[in-house]
Amino acid sequence: MKNESYALEIERFFDYFVNELKLTNKSKYTIISYNTTIKSFIEFIRQYEKSVSFENLKKIDIMNFLEYKNMVLEKQSELEMSSKKLYITHLKTFFTFINENLDTDIKLSAIFKINIKVPKRTPKGVENKDVQILEEYLANIQLNNFLNIRASLILKILLYSGARRGELEVLKTKNFVADGELYIIHTIGKGDKERTLYIPKKYIQKEISYYISNDIEFIATTKSGKVMDGSQIYRFLNNTYKKIGIKYSGAHILRHTFAKSMIAKDVNIVTVKELLGHASIQTTMIYTNPNQREVQKAYLDTLK
């Protein structure tokens, strides 16, 4: 392979880069995300027909990497714009690190000045009728074994606190602090920032008591005591949705449902921003866009 030596050089820098991420207390989720992007880029370099190095790497090579990612997608679908933007961000940060540790005058970060516009979409939450099905399932689930207790706790945290999947992955029983009618939950959020979640104590008191009495450290844990990773949480949620007869996937749909329910109850947008852990209120504003049914209803109401 013509680029093998370059690929090995990138790998060497990546080992140092990962050490820096760990030393600066970046979350496991962040490190995994970088690992996925950079390893994919290294594999692309190994297969790339053009001979490249730090000295002659160009913007067109990065665009070809994005095209390569399109081709290797298991799903027959276009690579999401948000994914492209994330890959560029990861590579720019990594190559900036290389620049700081490489004896060269070349500004590698300039290669990644690629403007990728991510279309604004109104997030879809769980339909009201399906929320009722999910809540009925949670109300009737028998808390008589570990798997049922874990299922109840994970679903309630995602549905009623607005937690992200990555936040759930690192959440520990000791992070739950009782304060009046609430549990205040301290965790690490997106961008490795400290984040506070809230959930009514009455919703999960039995589950938390079980975890404490059985010395279970992590909320998302397997029966054998191992911490669940993102793919295991994803499969657990999808299996649960299928079991109760609703067609959704993953954890983020429940976060969207939480956000939309707050907006529907006229909770102040600044408060919603804090509850979701958004860095910018502009991100939160996407939940204020009315859906098509709301627009139609409002229009018909004006004709009455």
Language-model region placement:
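N-terminal core-binding DNA-recognition domain of tyrosine recombinases/integrases
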Residues: 2, 12-29, 35-122, 141
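Alpha-helix N-cap/helix-start motif at helix boundaries, enriched for small hydrophobics
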Residues: 91, 154-155, 162, 166-171, ...
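Long, amphipathic, Lys/Arg-enriched alpha-helical "connector/arm" segment
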Residues: 120-146, 163
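Catalytic-site neighborhood detector that most strongly recognizes the C-terminal catalytic loop/helix
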Residues: 125, 188-191, 276, 282-301
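Short basic/aromatic active-site micro-motif
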Residues: 149, 247-266
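C-terminal catalytic core of tyrosine-transesterase DNA break-rejoin enzymes
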Residues: 156, 160, 257-279, 286
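Conserved tyrosine-mediated DNA breakage-rejoining catalytic core shared by Y-recombinases
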Residues: 161, 165-166, 170-204
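Active-site/catalytic core of tyrosine-dependent DNA strand-transfer enzymes
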Residues: 200-246
